[in-house]
Design a protein with these regions (language model features):
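Terminal alpha-helical anchor/extension segments at protein ends
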Residues: 1-163
Length: 163
């Protein structure tokens, strides 16, 4: 897995932040896309139609001549699941603008698939953009917005208590 370092080029102004900043938290069930619009973050939830993992609970023998659970490690259902997952990752990748600073976050391997797909799309049109990848558990919307602000150098919002 290749990940951009935090010292790479970051947008300087609020206008750059508004045009280029996006954070994607993704797993097989959904993606949460956090994008700047002026002074606020716009949050979009994308649900997937990826079927759940079907895990065997014990040995299943289909053929007495084949040992330990059957001839193929992947069932037909698992292959279909991966096809659905690839379509979902493509749909999320196509929602991101080409000039945005991208932060991809997730707790499984789906965020790595999204990173690979974004890099593949970038190489097809001979461009490069900053893609920062991090493994993380599920976070609240506020935590995702704060992480995007931190990556873009905007810092947390400060409010005065009382007046």
């Amino acid at each position: 897995m290749t990940a951009a370092t935090e010292t790479e080029a970051r947008p300087d102004t609020t206008a750059d932040i508004a045009h280029r900043g996006v954070l994607v938290w993704i797993d097989a069930r959904e993606a949460v896309v956090v994008r700047w619009t002026g002074e606020e973050a716009a949050i979009e939830h994308l649900a997937s139609d990826v079927p759940a993992h079907a895990r065997a609970t014990r040995h299943v023998r289909y053929d007495p001549l084949t040992r330990h659970g059957g001839p193929d490690r992947q069932s037909a259902g698992e292959r279909r699941r991966i096809e659905h997952l690839d379509r979902f990752v493509d749909a999320v990748a196509n929602r991101l603008d080409r000039d945005e600073y991208v932060v991809v976050v997730g707790h499984g391997t789906v965020h790595e698939r999204l990173e690979a797909r974004l890099r593949e799309l970038d190489s097809q049109v001979r461009r490069s953009r900053t893609i920062n990848v991090r493994r993380a558990d599920r976070a609240t919307e506020r935590q995702l917005v704060a992480e995007l602000r931190e990556h873009l150098g905007a810092g947390p919002r400060r409010q005065r208590v009382g007046s």
